[in-house]
Amino acid sequence: MHIDHAHVHGHRIRYAVRAGDTSRPPLLLLNGLGANIELALPFIDALDAPSVITYDVPGVGGSPTPPSPYRPSNIARLTAELLDHLGFEEADVLGVSWGGAIAQQFAFQHSSRCRRLVLAATSPGALMVPAQLPVLLKMLTPRRYVDREHALKVAGDVYGGVFRRKPAAVMHAFDHVRFSSRGGYYMQLAAAFGWTSLPWLWTLSQPTLIMAGADDPLVPIVNAYVMQWLIPDARIEILDCGHLFLVTRAEESARIVESFLTESAESGLRRGRRAASRVPSSPLRRMS
């Protein structure tokens, strides 16, 4: 995997490219809160064919903390400019957790550049069914990334799945953590504040795969079903795992994603036509 830096949208961004099948669009991976490139390596390594692009958000990993806050729309634009820098017109986009918000924003804001969309362990943002308050409070600090004892203590409560039974497994999952700064972490939190995709999810035209963990304390599974109902051409896959299934179930997750990315356009179109009847008009109009 090639790692380098680029100046895009006013930021110096650390990015990575894993070479793969050049006959298809690359998979653009948008990571979660405080998560640097290397945290996604188990999933990237499990993928067989596609080229993969991922990067550290400003203030995370090897990307310097910016002097001022940003919004998801800014990061979506940064993402588009990174694709320009790398010479790609379009990509399949996978967003996990916080990165799922950016993936939704990118698919909406730059729809012609997003061929297929994968939303993993994520939600529509502020207008979601939230986690329980103790879980949310644990996420307000990046302490789990820098304090191993604290990570062991909170892993099961925050991430669920295997970490409830084996908290020490979080040490393996966090082997590649490259924590940058508290400022960068809090900027990510601030970017998500007040953001929601709920009013426009029904406009997304991309075939969409929604993946959720059955035991995800951070993003309750009902949010996946809400997104499936609102996005016209969406399917859902539930994994018997917690929030970090892309890491803890990397092989299984990779098979599901690759199957979705390589299915025929005809089958996706047929499914889209069937699904479109579920959302005939804006959900805001239906609520009025």
What are these model-derived regions, one by one?
Residues 54-94:
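Active-site loop/oxyanion-hole signature of alpha/beta-hydrolase fold enzymes
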